[in-house]
Curated annotation (Swiss-Prot):
Residues 21-46, 49-75 form the Antistasin-like domain. It holds the Pfam family Antistasin. Residues 1-19 form the signal peptide. GO terms for cellular component: extracellular region. Potent inhibitor of factor Xa. It also inhibits trypsin in a weaker manner. This is Therostasin. GO terms for biological process: regulation of vasoconstriction. Keywords: Protease inhibitor, Repeat, Secreted, Serine protease inhibitor, Signal.
């Protein structure tokens, strides 16, 4: 039983010391940097953005400012759907959904 406790302690230490982050590929990129959590893992939020989430559904997503931050409860229109959206990798903003695909 004592060996199991030591093994668990070592496993926990390794997770904290060496980062046990999932291989996170964020669908959207940030014009600047991403925020990282207390373990050093990527949160997929742009640095300086508020992570408050609105409870309404926007078919075209939420408006986005020049820093890559989504507005709080302001839905996109057809005119604003892909403004200020930076997609990662080979993804592009889909004007029908406002999401990087």
């Amino acid at each position: 039983m004592r060996g199991l406790a030591v093994l668990l302690l070592v496993a926990c230490f390794c997770s904290v010391a060496f980062g046990d982050c999932e291989n996170t590929e964020c669908p959207r990129a940030c014009p600047g940097e991403y925020e990282f959590d207390e373990d050093g893992c990527n949160t997929c939020l742009c640095k300086g953005c508020n992570d408050a989430q609105c409870r309404i559904y926007c078919p075209l997503g939420f408006t986005t400012d020049a820093n890559g931050c989504e507005s709080f409860c302001t839905c996109n229109t057809r005119e604003t759907v892909c403004q200020n959206v930076v997609c990662s990798g080979k993804r592009v903003c889909n004007p029908r959904s406002g999401r990087c695909e």
